[in-house]
Amino acid sequence: MERAMANVDLGPYRRIVQIFWDPEPTNDVVHDQPVWCLGRSYRLNGKKNIKADDHHPQTPPSVLKAETETQEAHDTAQPPNPPTNAPDTPPDSISSSFSSSLAYDDPVVDGGWPSGFISDFESKIWMTYRSEFEPIPRSTNPQATSALSLSMRLKSQLGDQSPFSSDSGWGCMIRSGQSMLANTIAMVRLGRGDWRRGESVEEECRLLKDFADDPRAPYSIHSFVRHGASACGKYPGEWFGPSATARCIQALTNSHESSIRVYSTGDGPDVYEDEFMQIAKPPGEDFHPTLVLVGTRLGIDKITPVYWEALIAALQMPQSESQGKYYQYITRTFSALTIRSGRPSSSHYFIGAQGSFLFYLDPHHTRVALPYHEDPIEYTSEEIASCHTPRLRRIHVREMDPSMLIGFLIQNEVDWQELKRNVKHVQGKSIIHITDRNAVLGGSSEGRESAIDEVETLSDDDTDTIHEA
């Protein structure tokens, strides 16, 4: 439903229509479950907001979650929580339970969500479809048309051979990739800490300038398409998959960005420490903040339940000004319209979690192109606001597409050691694996014996051309 609405110009009536057709999720204020945004926890009951590493420096986030909820249940004399190995499914947005109905007798401001969570969520940089940018020429290759999404092929067959001045209908994965990269850079430059909208405006404008919809911007839609065509076999107007997106992020960042580096695993879940360290800390150099990108598939049609716990726990990883590791991921999901037909649909950027629900930023909203200003201070408040949203969207983990690109930021060697420890202690089945070296390339027999059985490779050739953005 949300995807269909995003492509319809409702003008001043959009908000009214959304209330009935696409309502925002509401928080169960009685149960007051913690809600997480990239490693920070928020709740309503006045208790101190926590980070996953507060007072528990040696406790994995998933275990900490169970301990925290058990203690809170005891303190408030609430009925005990279900076992930690059971799926943690909170009440739906509209609950029929007696206690929940009492909670919604009176209107709840901002859906009952903690104000700190809303402020944190809104501060995340949100890249969406854009229109009216400098046209991107179509490919002259005869195979280019067949590689386009269905909607774009129909337009071509109806005689529309004009260059692309909008990425609506094909650029959602690129926009999600931009969101991931922009928020990673923001954390390094601005600090995860308590940075919120309206603070360090000039620095934020310098960051947004790099993502402007202009060929001069290093991380523009034009730059992604240009590198996709030259190095990934992607034609202009063709839907990108996780692998192509990761390769573009890595190449563009390593060419233009001095504050971070990028390590990509390619099409599998295995991270090799020797390869990672060659990028993050070459001999004789200090450690460089490094974004690790993992392309993986956690099931066939849906995410296998054994991965649920680890996937949700990933968004609870600790971070602060000094400890900057956090997880984020992009996946194709099923929207309300396509659940019934079972067709894979869209790319979304996930940054938060509550129980078994995950919160995401949706790129399927077309806005006027973000201009390129030589002087970043020239960005208007409206242009900056177009890169943020307080609009919450969430999906249950069981409804997510299993094909995804996972990203996490390692700021220093302490982060790296902690990540390795947490991966070993995660509940359920780990979504990534860390080994000392690539046994195949290094000629060593060492490595995980179960690696061959576990790996499901993720190839853009298998996944991209059948999807519409």
UniProtKB/Swiss-Prot annotation:
SUPFAM superfamilies per UniProt: Cysteine proteinases
GO biological process: aggrephagy; autophagosome assembly; mitophagy; piecemeal microautophagy of the nucleus; protein processing; protein transport
Pfam families on file: Peptidase_C54
Active site: C172 (nucleophile), D362, H364
Ranges of compositional bias, category Basic and acidic residues: 66-75
Ranges of biased composition (kind: Acidic residues): 452-463
Biased composition, class Pro residues, residue ranges: 79-90
Major localisation: cytoplasm
UniProt key word Protease: yes
Keyword terms, alphabetized: Autophagy, Cytoplasm, Hydrolase, Nucleus, Protease, Protein transport, Thiol protease, Transport
Enzyme's top EC category: hydrolase
Superkingdom of the organism of origin: Eukaryota
Residue ranges, annotated region (Disordered): 48-99, 443-469
Keyword Zinc listed: no
InterPro entries attached to this UniProt entry: Papain-like_cys_pep_sf, Peptidase_C54, Peptidase_C54_cat
Reaction equations catalysed: [protein]-C-terminal L-amino acid-glycyl-phosphatidylethanolamide + H2O = [protein]-C-terminal L-amino acid-glycine + a 1,2-diacyl-sn-glycero-3-phosphoethanolamine
GO CC annotations, alphabetized: nucleus; phagophore assembly site
MF annotations from Gene Ontology: cysteine-type endopeptidase activity; protein-phosphatidylethanolamide deconjugating activity
Enzyme Commission numbers on file: 3.4.22.-
Function: Cysteine protease that plays a key role in cytoplasm to vacuole transport (Cvt) and autophagy by mediating both proteolytic activation and delipidation of ATG8. Required for selective autophagic degradation of the nucleus (nucleophagy) as well as for mitophagy which contributes to regulate mitochondrial quantity and quality by eliminating the mitochondria to a basal level to fulfill cellular energy requirements and preventing excess ROS production. The protease activity is required for proteolytic activation of ATG8: cleaves the C-terminal amino acid of ATG8 to reveal a C-terminal glycine.
Quaternary assembly: Interacts with ATG8.
Family stated for the protein in its record: Belongs to the peptidase C54 family.
Protein name, per record: Cysteine protease ATG4
Organism: Gibberella zeae (strain ATCC MYA-4620 / CBS 123657 / FGSC 9075 / NRRL 31084 / PH-1) (Wheat head blight fungus)
Name of the coding gene: ATG4
